[in-house]
């Protein structure tokens, strides 16, 4: 496993008198024995050991030179290049010629690397097609077939076909794929559902978790844990029986809870935080604390404006990417200033709701298999998590779920992430009713629901609306009997996407929905992307439920 399994702290060692090193806040007691600054890469089962390295690991100062020089407009381009020869030979050649007066960095890169392949398709959008027809015709365009592993490439080969989001994203992404699968099921593409189910199970078997995406530079983190929701979808659609995935679900759970048994109150390790009352909740995390390969220059620039140690900023930027909400006011100490990012100090409401679903799924499938002890254990875990969420993340005064700043011991900002407890059935009916009132008054627009009520310039904030948030809100409110609000969000979102499609003949990653006139969503570290996997998936599912807009 790469950068995933760190030696658990020995409980006996925690009792030894040692000098504690406080980093900004005494609540997170970081023992040197407990957390390493950067875990060493370990061999990934099924891959050559040399392929466990990221491009930044491999090319060292050459990587930094290329990214600093901005010879490609997108920082993701160079990490996605494949070397034409052994990387060590490339690095040796670079060190020999880099100080020559006539050295041309771009030519050097072009001579020694294959640039990322631009996927060519014969598909041309037909303005006469309905939205449903357009989406169904896009599935083959966004499908990638399995291929042999390219030596020293950052791309991790998968055994089966998969869907990519589109645009700059030429690999599969974990939580994106669940929402894409909703549409595949509606389109009758059980073949692709089976392939993607096999791929995610394979990744859990080989890496111990589902990484952010199938790139080496994504292996040090995951994304929102939605595999339990995928398994539920497979069962509903008759693609695969849920029982066959029980071991995979347990393995994913072990990844998210690693180190929990050794923590004392007010202490954190990787993804787990032991709260003051002894309960366990989770946070987003990345095992590396260096600039992201795919956004290297952006991360370096952000750290320069932080005032905090760069490695802390890098860790929090990476953890923000693991959240899927990269980036949002949710993770910022000062809204509107990315350099104030503090992702690892927040207990996110959506993450803990997804983990509640995972615990519940393990209990339910264990019951089907007659494993009574496992069922009882995980029902207790799910119940304990719900109780802890209600104690720390439920704002009873305002009737909303909020993230919790565990180091400052205070509630954080309100966002559309608050609807995830409804989607996974973790809330009670009073909480659902009160949350519905808050969403109506604070997030609902004629175009759908906003990611948050704060306008910061980050892409997961106002004025943007995102397909997965619409879907979870629609289904969540309807699950608790509020069909009126659920239907209103659904029809508003369908109208937004269809109106934009009629004008632009394309589907996009996010939409500006704050003023009732759908436009391209802004913000973020990269240009708006077309495609787009999860938008297609959610809209195709909604068309099946509500008809063409």
Curated annotation (Swiss-Prot):
One GO cellular component, as annotated: cytoplasm
Chief place of localization: cytoplasm
Catalytic function, reaction form: alpha,alpha-trehalose + H2O = alpha-D-glucose + beta-D-glucose
Pfam families: Trehalase
Domain of life: Bacteria
Binding sites annotated in the UniProt record for substrate: 168, 175-176, 212, 221-223, 292-294, 324, 525
Active site: 326 (proton donor/acceptor), 509 (proton donor/acceptor)
Claim: Isomerase is one of the keywords in the record: no
A GO molecular-function descriptor: alpha,alpha-trehalase activity
Claim: Nucleotide-binding is one of the keywords in the record: no
Localisation per UniProt entry: Cytoplasm
GO terms under biological process: cellular hyperosmotic response; trehalose catabolic process
The EC number(s) this enzyme carries: 3.2.1.28
Annotated metabolic or biological route of this protein: Glycan degradation; trehalose degradation; D-glucose from alpha,alpha-trehalose: step 1/1
Assigned keywords, A-Z: Cytoplasm, Glycosidase, Hydrolase
Class in the EC hierarchy, top level: hydrolase
Subunit comment: Monomer.
Record family assignment: Belongs to the glycosyl hydrolase 37 family.
HAMAP family: Cyt_trehalase
NCBIfam families per record: PRK13270.1, PRK13271.1
Function recorded in the entry: Hydrolyzes trehalose to glucose. Could be involved, in cells returning to low osmolarity conditions, in the utilization of the accumulated cytoplasmic trehalose, which was synthesized in response to high osmolarity.
Name of the molecule in the record: Cytoplasmic trehalase
């Amino acid at each position: 496993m790469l950068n995933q399994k760190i030696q658990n702290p020995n409980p006996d060692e925690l009792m030894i008198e040692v000098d504690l090193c406080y980093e900004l806040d005494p609540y997170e007691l970081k023992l040197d024995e407990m957390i390493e600054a950067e875990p060493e890469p370990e061999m990934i089962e099924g891959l050559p050991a040399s392929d466990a390295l990221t491009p930044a690991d491999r090319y060292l100062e050459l990587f930094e030179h290329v990214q600093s020089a901005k010879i490609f407009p997108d920082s993701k381009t160079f990490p996605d290049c494949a070397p034409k020869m052994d990387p060590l030979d490339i690095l040796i050649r670079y060190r020999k010629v880099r100080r020559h007066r006539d050295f041309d960095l771009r030519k050097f890169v072009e001579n020694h690397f294959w640039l990322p392949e631009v996927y060519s398709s014969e598909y041309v959008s037909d303005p006469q097609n309905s939205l449903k027809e357009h989406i169904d015709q896009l599935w083959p365009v966004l499908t990638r077939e399995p291929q042999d592993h390219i030596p020293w490439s950052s791309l991790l080969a998968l055994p089966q076909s998969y869907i990519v989001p589109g645009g700059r994203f030429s690999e599969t992404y974990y939580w994106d794929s669940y929402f894409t699968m909703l549409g595949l099921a509606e389109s009758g593409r059980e073949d692709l559902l089976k392939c993607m189910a096999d791929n995610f199970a394979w990744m859990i078997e080989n890496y111990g978790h589902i990484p952010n995406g199938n790139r080496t530079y994504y292996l040090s983190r995951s994304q929102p844990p939605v595999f339990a929701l995928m398994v539920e979808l497979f069962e509903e659609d008759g693609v695969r029986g849920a029982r066959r995935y029980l071991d995979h679900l347990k393995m994913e759970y072990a990844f998210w809870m690693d180190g929990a048994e050794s923590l004392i109150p007010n202490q954190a390790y990787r993804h787990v935080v032991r709260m003051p009352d002894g309960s366990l909740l989770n946070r987003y995390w990345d095992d590396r604390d260096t600039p992201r390969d795919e956004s290297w220059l952006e991360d370096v620039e952000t750290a320069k404006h932080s005032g905090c140690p760069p490695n802390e900023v890098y860790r929090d930027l990476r953890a923000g990417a693991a959240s899927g909400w990269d980036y949002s006011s949710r993770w910022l100490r000062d809204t509107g200033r990315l350099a104030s990012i503090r992702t690892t100090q927040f207990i996110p409401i959506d993450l803990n709701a997804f983990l509640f679903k995972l615990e519940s799924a393990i209990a339910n499938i264990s019951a089907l298999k007659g494993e009574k002890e496992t069922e009882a254990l995980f029902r207790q875990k799910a119940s304990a998590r719900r109780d802890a969420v209600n104690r720390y993340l439920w704002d009873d005064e305002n009737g909303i779920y909020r993230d919790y700043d565990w180091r400052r011991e205070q509630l954080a900002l309100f966002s559309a992430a608050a609807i995830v407890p409804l989607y996974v059935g973790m809330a009670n009916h009073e909480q659902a009713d009160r949350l519905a009132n808050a969403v109506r008054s604070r997030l609902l627009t004629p175009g759908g629901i906003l990611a948050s009520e704060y306008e910061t310039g980050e892409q997961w904030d106002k004025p943007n609306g995102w397909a997965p948030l619409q879907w979870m809100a629609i289904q969540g409110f309807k699950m608790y009997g509020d069909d009126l609000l659920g239907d209103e969000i659904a029809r508003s979102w369908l109208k937004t996407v269809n109106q934009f499609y009629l004008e632009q003949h394309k589907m996009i990653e996010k939409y500006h929905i704050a003023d009732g006139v759908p436009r391209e969503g802004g913000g973020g570290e990269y240009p708006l992307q077309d495609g787009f996997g999860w938008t297609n998936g959610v809209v195709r599912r909604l068309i099946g439920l509500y008809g063409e807009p």
